[in-house]
């Protein structure tokens, strides 16, 4: 069976370079293109060399339409505006679109889902096995514990991360809300400062820390009367996200059009 030909969006960034390395290590995929933002000083650079690998003669380019002509999929960990632009082209080309971009708005998510009647999209706030297992556990614990247990989510990332709370924190918050039978939008508490008053019952709180080179630490705290339960995950290397994204692309190749998540890829929907 031929290898899946994949484009890496944002190939010059930290995550993009990790994706290039993951593809180079894979027996089931090969790099078909390296996408970078128009005007970037990295346009024309060799994607292999940028990723710390031998030269692969695949240069960074801003022309997704051209590079997608012979591709089977795109791995997209960029910024919301770029992802939304990529969605239309990926759908038109009929290639798998793996979306790991965070900071997307509700309207952005609606645009992504709007193409899935004719396109294959796999989207997740986090592509690692551990975090997706954590999400399933959070949902089950939130369902099992009563409202006397307050839910707080703490996350830490490197100092260069531009959005907060992280996409993973929001993913865990949605899992907790689903377990409680509520919506996160109506029960989210963020950025507490000053005289805030007592904690509102039923809220799911978020706190974000930024510093150093942390790849991603997440803890979900269930704080009850006289006891606390803490479920945590620490990412030690962003390669776990790259390998997860690659797994998602290979899983989705040949699937019917639709909207999929890592729960589908990892078979977690029927875990509990």
Curated annotation (Swiss-Prot):
Reaction equation(s) it catalyzes: (S)-2,3,4,5-tetrahydrodipicolinate + NAD(+) + H2O = (2S,4S)-4-hydroxy-2,3,4,5-tetrahydrodipicolinate + NADH + H(+); (S)-2,3,4,5-tetrahydrodipicolinate + NADP(+) + H2O = (2S,4S)-4-hydroxy-2,3,4,5-tetrahydrodipicolinate + NADPH + H(+)
Domain of life: Bacteria
Keyword Repeat: no
Ligand binding (NAD(+)): 10-15, 36, 100-102, 124-127
Enzyme kind, highest EC tier: oxidoreductase
EC identifiers of the protein: 1.17.1.8
UniProt protein name: 4-hydroxy-tetrahydrodipicolinate reductase
Gene that this polypeptide is encoded by: dapB
């Amino acid at each position: 069976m031929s290898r899946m030909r994949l484009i890496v969006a944002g190939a010059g960034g930290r995550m993009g370079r990790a994706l290039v390395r993951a593809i180079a290590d894979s027996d089931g995929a090969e790099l078909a293109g390296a996408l970078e933002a128009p005007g970037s000083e990295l346009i024309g650079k060799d994607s292999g060399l940028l990723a710390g690998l031998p030269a692969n003669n695949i240069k960074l380019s801003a022309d997704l339409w051209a590079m997608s002509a012979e591709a089977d999929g795109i791995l997209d960990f960029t910024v919301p505006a770029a992802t939304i632009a990529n969605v239309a082209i990926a759908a038109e080309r009929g290639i798998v679109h793996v979306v790991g971009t965070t900071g997307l708005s509700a309207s952005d998510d609606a645009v992504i889902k709007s193409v899935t009647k004719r396109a294959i999209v796999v989207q997740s706030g986090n592509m690692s096995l551990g975090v997706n297992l954590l999400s399933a556990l959070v949902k089950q614990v939130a369902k099992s514990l009563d409202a006397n247990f307050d839910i707080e989510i703490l996350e830490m990332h490197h100092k260069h991360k531009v959005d907060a709370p992280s996409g993973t924190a929001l993913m865990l918050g949605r899992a907790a809300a689903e377990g409680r039978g509520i919506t996160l939008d109506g029960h989210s508490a963020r950025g507490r400062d000053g005289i805030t008053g007592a904690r509102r019952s039923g809220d799911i709180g978020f706190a974000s820390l930024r510093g150093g080179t942390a790849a991603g630490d997440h803890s979900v705290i269930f704080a009850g009367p006289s006891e606390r339960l803490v479920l945590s995950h620490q990412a030690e290397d962003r390669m776990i996200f790259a390998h997860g994204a690659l797994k998602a692309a290979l899983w989705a190749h040949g699937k019917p059009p639709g909207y999929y998540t890592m729960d589908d890829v990892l078979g977690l929907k029927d875990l509990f």
